[in-house]
Amino acid sequence: MIVVPVKEGENIEKALKKFKRKFEKTGVVKELRARQQFDKPSVLNRLKRERAIYVQKLQQVEE
């Protein structure tokens, strides 16, 4: 359960923004979307490998 303490006199939009930020960090929506369809393990492994290669290339460019 996400708890966002609201200080007295604090704007409700600011509190809502804090809530949204905390909610995004939990990854609930991302996991829900991932569970809507089944992906074969071989496809997941391939995507994971491709992402690792992409990240490696980005790190090499930075250096």
From Swiss-Prot:
One of its GO terms (biological process) is translation. InterPro entries: Ribosomal_bS21, Ribosomal_bS21_sf. Gene3D superfamilies: Ribosomal protein S8. One of its GO terms (cellular component) is ribosome. GO terms for molecular function: structural constituent of ribosome. Keywords: Ribonucleoprotein, Ribosomal protein. The keyword Ribosomal protein applies. NCBIfam families: S21p. Belongs to the bacterial ribosomal protein bS21 family. This is Small ribosomal subunit protein bS21. It comes from Phocaeicola vulgatus (strain ATCC 8482 / DSM 1447 / JCM 5826 / CCUG 4940 / NBRC 14291 / NCTC 11154).
